[in-house]
C-alpha cells in the first residue's frame, strides 16, 4: 500500500530551495567520485608519511572501492527506508567525518577503517543523485537540466581528480587530500536538511529485510574487486583469482534466487534498464579507462608529476563544460538511441586517436583526442539515463538507479584491471622486440625510439645497450599503452551493436514477481 501511495505522489514544484537541495546532492556525489582520483595520485606521499609498505598501500584505494561498490546497489533500499533527505544527511555526515578520520590516521589500520566508512558513504551519494532526478523533478526541461548537471559532474570529477590531487600534494600536506571534503560536506549537510523534501521514514522495513541476500551481494562484490586487483599480477586464471571470480558468480546467483532479495535484480527484466546498464558498463570501461591510461602514459613515459598531469587532462574537462549546454538542448528533441550511438561512436574515435602515440607525443598531439572524448561523453551518459530510468515507476527508480550506477563502476574496475594486464604484460614483450629490432632492423628500431641510426649502440656492446634501456622501456610502455587505447576503443564501439540489438525504446514496466520485495 505504501509503495502504491508513493507512486501516486507527484514531484513538488521545482523551487529555488529544491534546486539548492539537488545541488547539495550533486556536490556530495562529485566529492565521492573526486576523492578516488585525488587520493590515488598521492598514494606515495601517504605511504611515506605513515610508513606504510608499498605492498599494502594499494589496499588504501581497494578498500574504498569495495565499500563503495557494495553500497551503490543498496541505495534504493535505503532511500525507501530513510527518504532522500535523511539518507543524504546521514551519508554526507559519515563521508565528512570519515574524511576527518583519514586525515588524522596514525597507521595503516586506522586509515583503512576510515577509508571503508568513507567509501560506503560515497557509494550511497552517487546513485542518490540519479534517483533524485526522477523523484524530485517532473518530466520536462527541469528533469533534463537536472540530468545534465548530475551526468556532467559524474564524468567531470574523474577528470579533475588528478589536477586537484596534484595541486594539494605540491601545495599542502597530505592531510588536505581528505580535509578538502570538510567544508563542502558541512555546507551541503545544512542545505540538505533545510532544502530537500520532508517525507516519512519507513524504519519498519528493517524487520522484513532479507539480510541473507545482502550478505551474498556484499561478499560477491568484494570478491570480484579483490580478484580484479590481483588478476593483472597473478594472472586471470590463477587459483586465487579464479576463486574470487567463482565466489562472485555464486554470490550473485544465490542473491538473485532469494524470493525477496534486498536488491531488486528483477528490474533488469525491463529492456530499457537492462540495455541501459550494459551501456553504462561499457561507458565505465571507456571513461575510467581513459582517465587512468592518459596519466599512466604521462607519468611513466614523460615523468610528469600529479599537478602537470592534471593540467594536461584539464582539456577534457573544459570540453565537457563547453559542450554541456548543447547536450541539454539536443537531448530534449532527438531520439535517445540515435544520440547514444553518436556519443559512443565519437567517444570510441577519441579513444582510438590516442592509440598512435610515440615517446615524443606531447600536449599538442594529445589535445584533439581529449577534446573529442570530452565533447561527446555527455551523449554517452545523458540519453542512456533518459531511457534506462525514465520509464521506471517512482517506487522502483532508486533501485534502478543503483543498478545503473553499479554497472558503470563495475565497468571501470574491469577496464582498469584489463589495462594493467595489457600494459604490464605486453610492455616487457615489446622491450624484447625492440632490442631484437636494434640488431635486425636498426632503422625501424631508431624510429620507435625517437633516435637516429647513428645514435643506436652496437648490438654487441652491453654497456651501450644499457645506456638506451631507459628509452627502450619508455618506448615499450608506449606501445603497450597504445594497444590498451585500441582495446578501449573497440569495447566502446560495441555499444553501437548493443543499441542496434536493443530496438525501439519500450515503455511497459516489468511486473513485480510474486513474493519479491516491492
What residues fall within each predicted segment?
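Helix-loop-helix hairpins in multi-pass membrane proteins, especially solute transporters
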Residues: 41, 74-212, 239
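MFS transmembrane alpha-helix packing/gate-lining sites
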Residues: 64-71, 121, 153-157, 319-320, ...
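Small-residue-rich packing faces within the transmembrane alpha-helices of Major Facilitator Superfamily
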Residues: 69, 96-97, 182-189, 348-349, ...
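Hydrophobic transmembrane-helix bundles of small-molecule transporters
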Residues: 148, 170-280, 286, 304-305, ...
